[in-house]
Structures are given as C-alpha cells and as structure tokens.
Amino acid sequence: MQVLRERGIVRLRKFVSAGITAATITRMERAGDVIRLGRGLYQLPDAPTSAYHDHAVVAKVIPTGVICRVSALAFHELTDVIPSRVWIAIGPKDRKPGLAYPALQVVRFSDRHIRAGIEHHNIDGVDVLVTAPARTIVDLFRYRQAEGPRFKSSPGLNIALEGLREALRQHKATPAEIARCAEQVGSWPVIRPYVEAMTANA
C-alpha cells in the first residue's frame, strides 16, 4: 500500500482518512499483508527497519515524547549498554502511555525542560525526538542513581561517566556544550569535576 510505503509506520486513523476502513485493515492483517505493531499501529511485513525501529514505534504512538537517558546514549553510540526497554520522557501532565511493545521506561520532564536540547531524527520514516548528546549526559548525571529493574545492579554514575568519556572522545559534545546545558538545569557543580578531570590531560 502506498501510504505504508511512504510513511513506514501508519496509525489506523490515517488509513481511515485515506478511505480505507478498519475492517479492510483487519482483513489485510489476517492475510499477512500488514503487520499490527500495536493498538491501531501498522507496517508492511517486508518494511526495511533500522536498529532503532523500536524508537520509531514509540514515537508514532507518543509523538511528543522524547527518547532520553540510556536509550538516547545508546542511540548516539556513546555506550555499550543495550537497554532492555525504551526510555521515553513525557511532560508533567501527559498521560502515561499504555504500550504492550516495546517495553517502556517512562520519566517526566518539566514544561521548561521538555524541549531543551532536543534533536529530530528520521528513523524508518518517523520523526523521532531524541535528547542531544550534551543534554543526555547532563540528564544521566542529574539522575545518576540506578533506575528501573534493568539497572538495579548497574550504578547510574558509571553509565554517565561512560557517556561523558565517549562524547568527548568522539567529539559529539564539547565541554562548553555540556557546561551550558548543565548550567541551565543547575547541575554544573555536580558535573564540573568530572568534565575537568577528563579534559585535564586532553
């Protein structure tokens, strides 16, 4: 179907607006012509997908959500950790999404910070919001205690340090960018010693 080829992942309401009924989509699903990813979410069975297809699925369901923390760090290739769930930030008053797959780790950003340091990335035809490398590192230091069942035995500080080290080594974030981002949220006193230690002999 053209709409699926063009968009990759399509909501049911998009089909309906194109004149395709829900009953037709159900028949196509039973015939194997489309795959149901989640409630009201479909793609072609042979659609090319990237390593971060789960991010695209989440963004289609939660278009204002922001991929953050460990998921953002992995997306920017700044850690060897492979998160078992997608870390997604939503606003303080947004309803917590119910999604059977992929598994989510939902956090909340304030209205002030929900759009600060955010990048747009096209993943499998979907516009996905991801925290920029500097913002990602600052967030990991701000919330450096272990969070979620996947990280109970993995200290958050270690992941933050790995991200900082790799971001500086790969030139994906400069000390100035990290400092500026940290100052905006009042976390520079916490992060500064680590940045200075890693750049002292650079």
Language-model features: locations:
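Short amphipathic alpha-helical segments and their helix-coil junctions
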Residues: 51-53, 112-124
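Short His-Asn-centered micro-motif
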Residues: 18, 90-91, 131
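Hydrophobic alpha-helical interaction segments
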Residues: 118-202
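Short helix-to-loop capping/linker segments positioned immediately adjacent to catalytic or ligand/cofactor-binding
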Residues: 12-16, 77, 125, 148-151
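Exposed, interaction-prone assembly regions rather than primary DNA-binding/catalytic cores
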Residues: 73-118
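Short beta-edge/loop segments at beta->alpha junctions of small alpha/beta modules
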Residues: 1-70, 98, 194-202
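Hydrophobic/basic alpha-helical segments enriched in Actinobacteria
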Residues: 14-17, 28, 33, 64-67, ...
